[in-house]
Amino acid sequence: MDIALAIKALILGIVEGLTEFLPISSTGHLILAGQLLDFNDEKGKIFEIVIQFGAILAVCWEFRHKIIDVIKGLPNDPRQQRFAINVIVATIPAITLALIFGKAIKAHLFNPIVVASAFILGGFVILWAEWRERHRGETHDPRANALLEAAKAGAPRIETLDDLRISDAIKVGFAQCFALIPGTSRSGSTIIGGLLFGLSRKVATEFSFFLAIPVIFGATVYELYKSRALLSADDLSIFAVGFVAAFISAFFCVRWLLKFIATHDFRGFAWYRIIFGIIVLATAYTHLIAWQA
């Protein structure tokens, strides 16, 4: 095994695992890291699919009991049937647009300038969404009981995954479509979209995790099938390094995020996106780093 290549695979696997489920865009980070490490050829793109699969398996393991309950309940449990339907209908919009526009998006938008711009814009959207969330319960009606009105208006409408309606799932599904733009963040689009549509922070985050399973699994199977002619046995060791690194880092990241959202909002991630995006644009326009278009 080429040690230098293995180190690159390890770094990219960790980057994928740490960014896939945070609202900071794993695709954007992989595009930038891939260019910095000179690991962005056709094999590198296949490698990205493999490590994304490693990350999604970490989510499957973390939520294995819920997944098993859904599978067991599909024949006769209305709650599990409704949950499965919600995941399916929320997945359809993004998959449909990806099939129609996927090639054009990869050809024209997968570059550092677009990624950095999406980082910055997405950061401001998160700040706005969090501001809206904090002020959700405010009322300016002097005739109303302020405390009562704030309690009614400020509480999220959906506190558990079982409360999620098909209409809510469809809205989150359309929000996920924004993630087709690299640098936007699939988890960021679905979590922030969920908050705006009345989901609690916990429900929005967990539903985002579950939405990732069919989306990333489907993309993995599709891309590996398309690129099967480029794969060889020599790639297995490098792919395995990245896969394991992505699985382990994603597993700990998911557990950390579930604890984090209990007491924190996403403003820190928003400022990270904005600052990082500005740095990337600055390095591009000053030619400090020769980013590829």
From Swiss-Prot:
Protein's GO biological process: cell wall organization; peptidoglycan biosynthetic process; regulation of cell shape; response to antibiotic
Subcellular location: Cell inner membrane
Gene Ontology molecular function: any one: undecaprenyl-diphosphatase activity
Annotated S-S bridges: none
Main EC class the enzyme belongs to: hydrolase
Transmembrane segments: 3-23, 43-63, 85-105, 109-129, 203-223, 238-258, 269-289
GO cellular component: plasma membrane
Similarity section: Belongs to the UppP family.
Other facts noted in the record for this chain: Bacitracin is thought to be involved in the inhibition of peptidoglycan synthesis by sequestering undecaprenyl diphosphate, thereby reducing the pool of lipid carrier available.
Name of protein: Undecaprenyl-diphosphatase
